[in-house]
Amino acid sequence: IVPGLQLAHRGFMQGIFVAEEIAGLNPTMQADINIPRVTFCEPEIASVGMTEKQAREKFGDQVRTVEYNLAGNGKSSILATSGIIKLVSVEGGPIVGFHGIGARIGEQIGEGELMVNWEAYPSDVASLIHAHPSQNESLGEAAMALAGKPLHVHN
């Protein structure tokens, strides 16, 4: 038994790591902080990467955050749901954390994981086109706000 969060997808990843290690493929292990975490309740809670507090401990005053209220998201309005997306980044640097709460927010963790693990800059994500209406747009809009180009920010 490996200590840490007992998540099926974490165990699956660790199993692949062991198999590749045995095969001599020299795999690298994903840091636990970069493994997506989702609590399937109502509303759902999803997170990957550093919290704002963890980022401030590492990067100090260089940390930038944005909270995007899902009230500004068309699909969330259609679904009559609410919640927030929070992105944590380093000024002039990558996004280091994604956090969200709201109905179906666990479905957004994939893009959040890509942003964090690929060290995407807010401007990189802001330049991507997100389908409308989709809750996924909220990640793009949060990145736009973090990049200094807010579109529909409702705080």
Per-range role (PLM):
Residues I1-I33, G93, S134:
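Rossmann-like dinucleotide/flavin-binding elements
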